[in-house]
Swiss-Prot record:
Role: Putative FAD-dependent oxidoreductase involved in the resistance to cercosporin and other singlet oxygen-generating photosensitizers. Translocates from mitochondria to the nucleus under apoptotic conditions, where it degrades DNA and induces apoptosis.
Top-rank EC class of the record's enzyme: oxidoreductase
Localization of this protein: Mitochondrion outer membrane; Nucleus
Disulphide-bonded residues: none
Name of the featured protein: Apoptosis-inducing factor 1
Required cofactor(s): FAD
Record-level GO BP terms: apoptotic process; positive regulation of apoptotic process; response to singlet oxygen
Primary localization: mitochondrion
Note: Present with 1560 molecules/cell in log phase SD medium.
EC number: 1.-.-.-
Taxonomic classification: Eukaryota, Fungi, Dikarya, Ascomycota, Saccharomycotina
Superkingdom: Eukaryota
């Protein structure tokens, strides 16, 4: 009989958390106890979540956790309230000691996307409420024209096209650059211009090179710049300016960068933890790129590095992941089920632009929902 005397704790049940837990269990399950901390009995697939604002087909974005998690992994339904380099304290005040900790806590996505931290098991109630708010609103305003808000606007444009054209329903975006999508170097100007032009030409009102400001006394009024007298009123305002990393409370000095992301090496080891037994992966890290393009490489590298750390400690020779430190990222922006634009960087040739019909076929139609289960499970 094997006695599990050592704990590997994974916090977060997104694609990376579940995948890493599965891989570690398959490699180490006979020797180590693999524990997964999650706030929900379900997993939530963010790439297809934008369509839940206009559709109730939850099966394309939500799955029971048990369907994608190896059965030998211990599920702890709770939240991580705090942690140090020895233990995680849960929301229930239970403390779990660990030999290795993997933080895959992701980001806190604003409404109407949310997360399992937001809605737990009550996803139907959450999305039905958001869909109702959207349906009832005459003017919907997005603060920030990043990737998710552009895709949300595309979904609403498809759903409410006739109402938008008639002026019965208005959708606006305030963005701090001259083109939509982040001016971060991940997206080329052609992709950004294509997305901007498509939304603008189809009735979405854009306020570019502008930062929205609000007052507590007028929550439905957004001023077009700090100190500006110009403003717009909207009965539904969604604030989506960048992602907000979901980092549990801790007292570890210099754990996060100025934006709140956990600082990690390219091997996923957390820089601020001298013991070398804490790793982080996914949206919670300070990697330049956040997404699933490198999912297979990242999961394999982290699994290998955790095993090396268990065997050799701080002296372990860890391998680096391909983290897209420079250049453009392979990207497809869906703008409803029948529209979208994309780009793909090629060695020596540079970044090529992917025709809209190919993005529509490859991504927009199903938003990768057909790949959801394997991305968690494999």
């Amino acid at each position: 009989m094997t006695i599990n005397t050592k704990n590997i704790v994974v916090v977060g049940a997104g694609v990376f958390g579940v995948s890493v837990a599965n891989h570690l269990y398959r490699e180490l399950g006979g020797t180590y106890a693999i524990k997964l901390v999650t706030a929900s009995n379900y997993v939530y697939f963010l790439p297809s979540a934008v369509r839940l604002t206009v559709s109730k087909d939850y099966t394309k974005s939500i799955l029971p956790l048990k369907n994608v998690l190896d059965s030998g992994i211990e599920v702890i339904k709770d939240t991580a309230a705090s942690f140090d380099d020895k233990e995680v304290v849960l929301g229930s005040d239970r403390a779990i000691k660990f030999d290795i900790l993997v933080l895959a806590t992701g980001s806190k996505w604003a409404d109407p996307i949310g997360s399992t931290y937001t809605f737990g098991d009550n996803y139907k109630e959450y999305f039905e409420r958001e869909a109702s708010r959207i349906s009832d609103a005459d003017h919907i305003l997005f603060l920030g024209g990043g990737f998710v808000n552009c895709e949300l606007a595309g979904e609403l444009l498809f759903k409410y096209l006739e109402e938008i054209r008639s002026g019965k329903k208005r959708i606006s975006i305030i963005h701090n650059s001259d083109k939509l999508l982040p001016d971060s170097g991940l997206y080329n100007d052609t992709l950004r211009k294509n997305v901007t032009d498509y939304l603008s030409k189809n009735g979405i009102t854009l306020y570019l090179n502008t930062v929205g400001a609000s007052l507590d006394t007028s929550p439905k009024r957004i001023f077009l710049g700090e100190g500006s007298s110009k403003y717009i009123d909207a009965d539904l305002i969604y604030r989506g300016v960048g992602i907000s990393p979901n980092v549990p409370v801790n007292s570890i000095s210099d754990l996060c960068d100025k934006k709140g992301f956990i600082q990690v090496e390219k091997n996923f080891r957390v820089k601020a933890v001298e013991a070398g037994n804490v790793f982080a992966i996914g949206d919670v890290t300070n990697f330049r790129y956040h997404g699933l393009v490198k999912r297979d490489n990242w999961v394999d590298v982290l699994t290998r590095n955790v095993i090396s750390s268990l065997q050799e400690g701080t002296e372990a020779s860890l391998v680096d992941a391909d983290c897209l430190e420079t250049g453009h990222a392979p990207s497809g922006v869906s703008l409803g089920p029948n529209a979208g634009f994309g780009q793909f960087p090629l060695p020596l040739l540079g970044t090529i632009n992917i025709p809209s019909f190919l993005i529509s076929r490859a991504k927009s139609k199903n938003l990768f929902s057909d790949k959801m289960e394997p991305l968690f499970k494999k």
